């Protein structure tokens, strides 16, 4: 799962770093770009993490999903008990 998320993040960051400055900006040298890269990565990672957490919380709070999760849990418990009594 981490690799699944890490590869696209790495590709985006490398693309951002290689894109270079806008024409109106002075061209920074390579060392200053590389110095800012960890800060940009940290900012991008925290933003991505916040958005992912918000999406997961939103999904958890939806009523239909909560009802579905409850129904699956109850059904699984019933099947488990039935199998336990049948094969015990």
UniProtKB/Swiss-Prot annotation:
Protein role: Inhibitor of lipoprotein binding to the low density lipoprotein (LDL) receptor, LDL receptor-related protein, and very low density lipoprotein (VLDL) receptor. Associates with high density lipoproteins (HDL) and the triacylglycerol-rich lipoproteins in the plasma and makes up about 10% of the protein of the VLDL and 2% of that of HDL. Appears to interfere directly with fatty acid uptake and is also the major plasma inhibitor of cholesteryl ester transfer protein (CETP).
Residue ranges that the Swiss-Prot or TrEMBL entry lists as coiled coil: none
Official protein name in the record: Apolipoprotein C-I
Gene name per UniProt: Apoc1
Record-annotated membrane-spanning stretches: none
Signal peptide: 1-26
Alphabetized GO MF terms: fatty acid binding; phospholipase inhibitor activity
Keyword Secreted set for record: yes
Family of this protein: Belongs to the apolipoprotein C1 family.
Cellular component aspect of the GO annotation: high-density lipoprotein particle; very-low-density lipoprotein particle
Main location: secreted
Keyword Cell membrane carried by entry: no
Pfam families listed in its UniProt record: ApoC-I (PF04691)
């Amino acid at each position: 799962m981490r690799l699944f998320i890490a590869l696209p993040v790495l590709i985006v960051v490398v693309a951002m770093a290689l894109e270079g400055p806008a024409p109106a900006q002075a061209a920074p040298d390579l060392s200053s770009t590389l110095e800012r890269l960890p800060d940009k990565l940290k900012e991008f990672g925290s933003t991505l993490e916040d958005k992912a957490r918000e999406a997961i919380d939103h999904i958890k709070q939806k009523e239909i999903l909560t009802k579905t999760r409850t129904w699956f849990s109850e059904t699984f418990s019933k099947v488990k008990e039935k199998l336990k009594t049948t094969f015990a």
